[in-house]
């Protein structure tokens, strides 16, 4: 996890690590998954809401949890059905922040420790968008991310570098977190030409950086809401 703090382009290294992991563990080779438009869950057919799933170990009193809770609270529930899947392979007991995540989610599930069982559970849910708040802090979640579970798969800013993973489609972060890394002589950002580097909305823009295997989408702002847990240390 410390490779991101060396001041180098880590994409070749991350791709090599990803390839090595799939060589050592053939079960991590991604298996094809299909989604049929006429086979959606009844809840989505009734509400029209997208099923957005967050998968992480860190739905707890941890920096990732503190920065993510408010984000989930502020998502528009008329558009999104929010599902939280907590990985419990080495931190099984919940804490007060875990309970807060349980309250703000439409559904809360603790994933089986067995990887095959966890994959089967997730694929039964017909998730539209799968979001990993971070990838890089524990091997189990990294391994899970080798598999295609949803049509769209994203990673947030919790670990600030590319995954090098071909089945992670988008890296979602803040212009304040990664834009300086893109703004070099060989990859300039032209703020005068809005169509060349940005599109979508007033809140986000797409950045065509070369240091990420994912499509990079940056918030015009921090893209986080900090939650201070009573009695905890920031």
Predicted segment positions?
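Alpha-helical solenoid repeat scaffolds of the TPR/TPR-like class and their adjacent stem/linker regions
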Residues: 1-186, 200-234
